């Protein structure tokens, strides 16, 4: 009996501790230029509007990353982001919507749990997973004050990119809110638009949840996500990389093997069949050589004549 009471007390303590660490929920968007199969399956696993635990969210992210089909894995933290922002002010996310709409794989989650531990570690475990799984050795960190002046790298090495955007202030003034969203949307476009490769995977969320309330049935960027069929995964950008980066033709020797070159035999039949052509080639060659010889002889005579004239003139001047 005492043992059972101890177990119950332990469970209640863990629940209370978890609740004390929970600081809210944030929406999340995941998308990839190239097809990342398996993402759509999670739509059936998560109830619409339900809070998705951080562990489950990380599992979805790892599924997206594990295909290693991107030249840049981008993690975006947008402090102060609310579900209402992505629903009520969807038009202000002009460039984010465009990136989602033109992706091959995309998913959104309305509510992902955020704890104090998550705020401290943020994308740390996912960054480590991406670098280990996809053999990525370089990481670029872009702080809020660098978002406006970011200059892209020019090398072609795969990278993990961490973007920390300026915070959305918890203002309910519609005009101010729209201006903040539009400004950060432009900042994100400035960064993503300068990446040397169009093949990217992006995870966009917030580790500093907003306290602004959202409608219970709010949808994330509905116009952007409506283009996707949740029952069919389709590669929509199969030609994008080839069109953006024209490749070089592989070297191929004219003859693969000298031993395979068939020798031309000047037999009687060959000579009879090609007598006219061979005669024309021979005559043309002789005439060409004769013409070259005459030209050379003529130039030689002109040089000798000019030399003699110059000598005569010098002699006359001397007298």
Swiss-Prot record:
It is found in: Endoplasmic reticulum membrane. GO terms for cellular component: endoplasmic reticulum membrane. Residues 297-319 are annotated as: Disordered. Glycans are attached at residue 173. GO terms for biological process: (1->6)-beta-D-glucan biosynthetic process; cell wall organization; fungal-type cell wall biogenesis. The chain crosses the membrane at residues 270-290. It comes from the Eukaryota. InterPro entries: Big1. This is Protein BIG1. It comes from Candida glabrata (strain ATCC 2001 / BCRC 20586 / JCM 3761 / NBRC 0622 / NRRL Y-65 / CBS 138) (Yeast). The gene is BIG1.
């Amino acid at each position: 009996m005492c043992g059972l009471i101890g177990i119950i007390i332990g469970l209640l303590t863990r629940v209370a501790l978890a609740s004390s660490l929970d600081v809210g929920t944030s929406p999340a968007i995941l998308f990839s230029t190239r097809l990342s199969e398996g993402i759509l399956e999670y739509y059936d696993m998560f109830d619409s509007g339900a809070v998705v635990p951080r562990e489950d969210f990380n599992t979805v992210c790892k599924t997206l990353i594990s295909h290693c089909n991107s030249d840049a894995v981008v993690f975006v933290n947008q402090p102060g982001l609310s579900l209402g922002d992505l629903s009520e002010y969807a038009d202000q996310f002009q460039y984010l919507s465009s990136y989602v709409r033109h992706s091959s794989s995309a998913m959104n989650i309305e509510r992902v749990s955020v704890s104090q531990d998550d705020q401290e570690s943020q994308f740390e475990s996912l960054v480590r997973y991406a670098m280990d799984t996809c053999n990525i050795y370089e990481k670029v960190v872009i702080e809020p004050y660098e978002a406006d002046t970011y200059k892209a790298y020019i090398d072609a090495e795969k990278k993990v990119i961490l973007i920390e955007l300026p915070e959305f202030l918890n203002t309910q003034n519609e005009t101010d809110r729209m201006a903040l969203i539009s400004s950060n949307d432009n900042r994100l476009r400035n960064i993503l638009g300068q990446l040397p490769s169009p093949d990217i995977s992006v995870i966009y969320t917030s580790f500093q949840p907003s306290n602004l309330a959202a409608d219970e049935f709010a949808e994330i960027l509905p116009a952007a996500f409506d283009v996707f069929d949740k029952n069919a995964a389709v590669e929509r950008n199969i030609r994008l990389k080839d069109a953006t980066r024209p490749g070089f033709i592989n070297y191929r020797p004219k003859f693969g093997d000298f031993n395979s070159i068939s020798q031309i035999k000047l037999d009687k039949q060959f000579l009879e069949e090609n007598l006219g052509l061979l005669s024309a080639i021979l005559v043309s060659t002789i005439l060409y050589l004769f013409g070259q010889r005459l030209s050379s002889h003529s130039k030689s005579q002109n040089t000798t004549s000019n030399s003699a004239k110059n000598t005569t003139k010098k002699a006359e001047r001397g007298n």
